[in-house]
């Protein structure tokens, strides 16, 4: 996965347990220039971060090259961590049609990698994620990143795109609890 900034967390002591006993969730925040991803394993007392990072594509790259890189990098993450569920950020209203089309293409590259692996795919609107993680649907990116750091007990503040992806995964964990704040829609 050359070119992607990636951090893999050291396995926690409970990592020796069989993978099937703890659900592994992949969150993806798609963008042409910086697609964030975060992989967590549901565990007690809190979820464990397995990997996080940002798939970076320079502005000088053609769109097709970026889309291929997003697909290939996410395919590699899926193969390495074997998630059972993927959560992708839902589409948001964009005033610029060109921006909306480009975002849709990046999202499509991510969805193909997930679908090819036969994974369950859900989407959650950005406001629902912020509401679930911070308690306020219009929260700033920094507030989301700080809460993700706290919830996952990360030593460092995650990059903004990776933080959003981890927030998506955490929102899915919350959505499967009895008192869900953010309902996910299956894609």
What feature does the model see in each segment?
Residues 1-187:
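Phosphate- and other anionic-substrate recognition elements at nucleic-acid/protein interfaces
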